[in-house]
Amino acid sequence: MGRAWNAFLLGFGALLLAAFCLAWAFVAVVLLAFTPAGTGRRIGRCAAMYAFRAWLGAMQTVGAFRLDLAALDELRGAGALVLAPNHPSLLDAVFIVSRLPEAVCVMKGSLLRNFLLSPAARLARYVPNDSLLRLISRAAPELALGGQLLLFPEGTRSVGTLGAFTEAVGAVSRRTGVPVQAIVIEDESRFLGKGWAFTRIPAFPLSYRVRLGRRFEPPSDVRAFTAELERYFARELAAGMGEVPAEGGVMAEPATRLRG
């Protein structure tokens, strides 16, 4: 595709997503004031799922994205989980939330105070990551209700290679007794990774594949678990599309290769 078309796709995607967020923010403000917490939680999470799904569908229709996210559907109805994906892009949470109605995002405190994102995030009862203790205290009741906590082990986006893991995933799993589900995101570009300028135009179409990895039981040793999880992701990402034998835990069936 030519540069002008790529620039159009970038602008189209950004404006459409901003329009979705702005429209829903106004609705969420009203719902926050007039709906009970449980009702608001369900509405907020379902709205996020369908809005992100609609946006991704539009981006596929115009030829900007090629996506294989079907593996995530296996997690519907799976009960409480700590979802632990690698984090190559700002789009990672969008991919996961678009398929899972019980996803509970862990967000920076500054984003939860953003006028565009705050109403929807508070309605869905998303969790701030200002401190580990606060994260655990806010995540525990959501997990007890069957939520699936989306928590990136790297803590921030990567810069093309896997970043160092924090102990947050293991700490939450240990304190709540909820298993950790590894999610592997394969990204053929570095679009919206750490250091990618929002005005930088990528070469569309962009291809993404999400597949399920091992499911880890709650650890007794958080530090050892974190090291094991980091090694696991390093092997999976190095293997690319290949399947790597599991070392204990549950390996999901591999997803199909990128379509289109």
What are these regions (language model features)?
Residues M1-L81:
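Membrane-anchoring hydrophobic helices of lipid-metabolizing enzymes
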Residues V30-Y50, T61-V62, G77-S131:
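Catalytic core of membrane glycerolipid acyltransferases/transacylases, capturing the structured
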Residues A70-N86, L116, R138-P141, P179, ...:
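Alpha-helical membrane-embedding segments
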